[in-house]
């Protein structure tokens, strides 16, 4: 005899529960001494497009759905989609461009495997603007960033996670998640 649900599936209720679970996983990893940054009215949002990290996936090559473009739409800034491994020239040009913005948001996607992404984050941190870095997959990307960088981990590269991160960056919601790993170098850096 087949099992029958006690009540019909409610797609809206399931979507709301999914959103609550996603928002509960957004994790604040590092808060600079100056606190959560005020990114201002025109932040520069940068990062690479989503790409397939394994042999399975339905990745659509759509720059409009890239983290920087989606984040810029949420925050009212400008979005620039970089290469997965930005060149030194691209990094220098973005650092120059960031000087004219009110703040910076950078999304990393496996930056621990693509060190040029972390080089970009460090170059942008040196500009001196309020800055936030968001790991869109693994939190390892965040451990080597300078002290002045506010860091969050979203664990996924989706429109929903980008909206949740934007709410945290605007101060509309908290980042209650917990980091599931400990990194000795990061712990030592935090103790200093």
Language model segments and positions:
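Preference for extracellular/luminal or secreted protein segments
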Residues: 1-192
């Amino acid at each position: 005899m087949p099992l029958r649900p006690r009540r019909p599936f409610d797609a809206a209720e399931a979507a709301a529960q999914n959103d609550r679970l996603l928002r509960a996983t957004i994790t604040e990893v590092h808060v600079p001494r100056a606190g959560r940054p005020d990114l201002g009215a025109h932040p520069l949002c940068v990062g690479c497009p989503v790409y397939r990290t394994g042999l399975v996936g339905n990745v659509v090559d759509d720059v409009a759905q890239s983290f920087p473009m989606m984040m810029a739409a949420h925050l009212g800034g400008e979005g620039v989609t970089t290469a997965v491994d930005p060149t030194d020239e691209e990094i220098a040009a973005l650092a120059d461009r960031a000087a004219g913005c009110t703040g910076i948001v950078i999304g990393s996607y496996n930056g621990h495997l693509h060190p040029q992404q972390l080089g970009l984050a460090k170059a942008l941190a040196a500009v001196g603007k309020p800055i936030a870095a968001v790991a869109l997959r693994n939190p390892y990307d965040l451990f080597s960033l300078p002290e002045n960088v506010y860091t969050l981990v979203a664990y996924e590269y989706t429109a929903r996670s980008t909206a949740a991160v934007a709410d945290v960056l605007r101060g509309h919601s908290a980042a209650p998640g917990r980091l599931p790993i400990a990194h000795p170098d990061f712990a030592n850096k935090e103790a200093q």
